[in-house]
Amino acid sequence: LYFNKYKIKCSIGKRGITIKKLEGDNKTPAGVFKFKSLMYRQDRIPKIKSRLKKIIIKKNMGWCDDSNSKHYNKLIKFPFNFRAEKLWLNKNIYDVIIVINFNMKPIIKKRGSAIFLHIAKKNYMSTRGCIAISKKNMKLLISKIDIKTKLKIY
């Protein structure tokens, strides 16, 4: 990942990058995207400075990845009747999440959901389609990006 003068180690989807992203394909979508918002665990990161809209992650929050739901690719609250990914995790990968504006306007069913920039596992293990970076680099990015910042994935 390159940002201004910084070269940032990252992990991507375990099946690579694609222009034909589909739900569950374990691929990172190719294209030019913007950042929508920032979600974070206030119990783990009490103060966060960002020009993005900030959302505090609560225990009952998730992201719908079920294309049969009208809430597909949106933030939801549990209990929820459709499949959704929990955002409150014991591991730290979702302590900070930057929502990438992929498949948002319009939302196309089965096109892919929950594409985030989040914290990488210690060994930079591949993701299910997200981009993951170190916590240190995440702090650097969140202090400098805003909704106009472009993310180019190719």
Predicted regions and their residues:
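Cell wall/extracellular polymer interaction/catalysis modules
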Residues: 1-128, 135-154
